[in-house]
């Protein structure tokens, strides 16, 4: 199967087999219509894109429509200037009965200097829906060390959500 891999191994430890429905790579060029007065991407625009990435990743995985249930801890670490190329690295980290966790890592590349900055990471909980009601998702079994690490991190976050709190801080496993 065709695979996608980056030459920026220190930032982009993400290999995608195009037949693997648990991972997604999407890119977006930051344009002036998405910017605020400081000529950097507006946070709301980024949130909108993150929601779309989570939707595409989860829908592609389960072959059903999905809706956003929650988003955990989006931190805006660095501004994203107009003209930069965003790369969204998304993965299915955990699947329950009708929902899944999608982890997303955002990289911003200055096209002129080729400098890459990890600007954001977050976790979306997406629910599979048919006819307005939650519906079962296909089972997921992590296979690689990275997938197992992400899965275990997702279980911890699920437990924290169940208890009604979620610690902010380092996003593991994206």
UniProtKB/Swiss-Prot annotation:
GO MF term set: long-chain fatty acyl-CoA hydrolase activity
Q: Which InterPro entries match?
A: Cytosol_ACT, HOTDOG_ACOT, HotDog_dom_sf, Thioestr_dom
GO CC, alphabetical: cytoplasm; cytosol
Q: Which UniProt keywords apply?
A: Hydrolase
Any idea where the HotDog ACOT-type domain is? 20-132
Record-stated family: Belongs to the acyl coenzyme A hydrolase family.
CDD domains named in the record: BFIT_BACH (cd03442)
Keyword Hydrolase attached: yes
Q: Which Gene3D superfamilies match?
A: Hotdog Thioesterase
For the biological process aspect of GO, one term held by this record is: acyl-CoA metabolic process
Provide the protein name.
Protein VdlD
- Among its keywords, does the record have Hydrolase? yes
Organism, by scientific name, is Helicobacter pylori (strain ATCC 700392 / 26695) (Campylobacter pylori)
Pfam families recorded for this chain?
4HBT
